[in-house]
Amino acid sequence: RQRQMCIRDSMRTAGILMPITSLPSPYGVGTLGQCARDFIQFLHRAGQTYWQILPICPTGYGDSPYQAFSAFAGQPLLISPDELIKDGLLYGDDLRDYPHFNPDHIYYGDVIPAKLRILHRSYEIFKESADLCMLKEFDVFCEHEKDWLDDYALFMAGKDAHGGACWLEWEDDLRDPDEEIKAVWCERLADSIEYYKYIQFIFFRQWNAIRDYAHVNGIKIVGDIPIFVALDSADVWANRDLFQLEKDGYPTVVAGVPPDYFSATGQLWGNPLYDWDYHKKTHYDWWMRRIKGQLNMVDYIRVDHFRGFEQYYAIP
């Protein structure tokens, strides 16, 4: 029996790369609902073992999963309205005026406001009628994830309060806050902060359900970690010592690559580079937490690009 198990474990396996956003859905973008379960069933019937996805962090204004507002948070656009209805966190009538989208393309400019309207409505229902069990679940989530969630929620609430501007354009006290100043802003933006925590609570609730469904059907999920983070992110705003930045917060150098096989003119990514000496002093704590968080969500991870740990370019 042991020999049979070894043979089975060493057999070749296959999988498919499919971004969750690309799954067919009536909501203009793929979700963590029935369309994800249908795809898992397809993989199971096809004898596949792996579902590889792109990063599922909240995207910035370029809609790229490799330029996210957080390396730890989940993408709100993936939340399924149908699952919200099942949980009593949305009503069917709330979708009556939801736009009809072309199923062949994703028009983020139209999808984002429509989806955010639904999510804000769900938050209102949660505040008005969530039962004690769900409220307790929410509190437990916030406590368990506070290591990144508190800064992320304040960061996003701060962006809303400043018309979506990059944190480098905020007033000095919130751009460079100490703990006392953070407490003042947390009180000032309390409802907006709780909204962003609620959205993450719902995202991870739905994500965990999809991950468990995949496991029941013999499918393992391969996640994706971009090696660099966006300048306009909670990660940089709240952890400036981790990056090569000037005193005013702007990068001293940024990421990119010279001309190569993929690009005749090279690529200027613009991400701030890590201060690896500082990471070493902290025993790479931030990276350890980042990888641990991802492995709590998926079975395997791909780092894009892994070679960046050994060699990278710095562009002034």
Located regions from the model:
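N-terminal regions that are enriched for targeting/export leaders
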Residues: R8-T21, R37
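Catalytic domains of carbohydrate-active enzymes, especially glycoside hydrolases
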Residues: Q34-T59, M297-V298
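Conserved, mostly hydrophobic/aromatic
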Residues: L43, I53, F155, A214, ...
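Alpha-amylase-like alpha-glycosidases and glucanotransferases acting on alpha-linked glucans and related
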Residues: P19, D63-F204, V229-P316
